[in-house]
């Protein structure tokens, strides 16, 4: 039997209100709340403000990461949510972001990561991990 180690959501959100995505000050609380809504464990986060507008950010999660880039002039947010463990956590975080940003359209892919790993193949000898 094969198992996947995580789920990866890659999304383009179109038609987002520029006021919500023009500054890191505006969008960072949305992303921080998405982490909480997704029951994810934040290790750290970093946000960057572009001039005159636009923002990027990344949150390092115990489960993996959440990142985004905004283009307010196009009403566009590109989003990346990758989590290991409970797959519904990524969905909850994604759903929250969609609910708050209210894009007019969304193009997304949801991939299982590491899906070719066989369940019965594991390194059990600690010396092999060095």
Curated annotation (Swiss-Prot):
Q: Which residues carry this modification: Pyruvic acid (Ser)?
A: 64
What's the cofactor?
Answer: pyruvate
User: What EC number(s) has UniProt assigned to this enzyme?
Assistant: 4.1.1.50
Gene Ontology BP terms: spermidine biosynthetic process
**SUPFAM superfamilies, from UniProt?**
S-adenosylmethionine decarboxylase
Q: How is it modified after translation?
A: Is synthesized initially as an inactive proenzyme. Formation of the active enzyme involves a self-maturation process in which the active site pyruvoyl group is generated from an internal serine residue via an autocatalytic post-translational modification. Two non-identical subunits are generated from the proenzyme in this reaction, and the pyruvate is formed at the N-terminus of the alpha chain, which is derived from the carboxyl end of the proenzyme.
Name of the protein? S-adenosylmethionine decarboxylase proenzyme
Please report the organism this UniProt entry assigns to the protein.
Picrophilus torridus (strain ATCC 700027 / DSM 9790 / JCM 10055 / NBRC 100828 / KAW 2/3)
The organism's taxonomic lineage, starting at the top: Archaea, Methanobacteriati, Thermoplasmatota, Thermoplasmata, Thermoplasmatales
């Amino acid at each position: 039997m094969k198992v996947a180690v995580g789920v990866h959501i890659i999304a383009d959100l179109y038609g987002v209100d520029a006021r919500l995505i023009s500054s890191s000050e505006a969008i960072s609380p949305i992303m921080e709340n998405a982490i909480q809504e997704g029951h994810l464990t934040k290790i750290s986060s970093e946000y960057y403000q572009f001039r005159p507008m636009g923002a990027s950010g990344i949150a390092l999660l115990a489960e993996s990461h959440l990142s985004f880039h905004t283009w307010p002039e196009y009403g566009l947010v590109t989003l990346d949510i990758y989590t290991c463990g409970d797959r519904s956590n990524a969905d909850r975080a994604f759903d929250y972001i969609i609910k708050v940003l209210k894009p007019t359209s969304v193009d997304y892919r949801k991939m299982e990561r590491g899906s070719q790993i066989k369940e019965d193949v594991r390194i059990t000898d600690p010396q092999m991990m060095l």
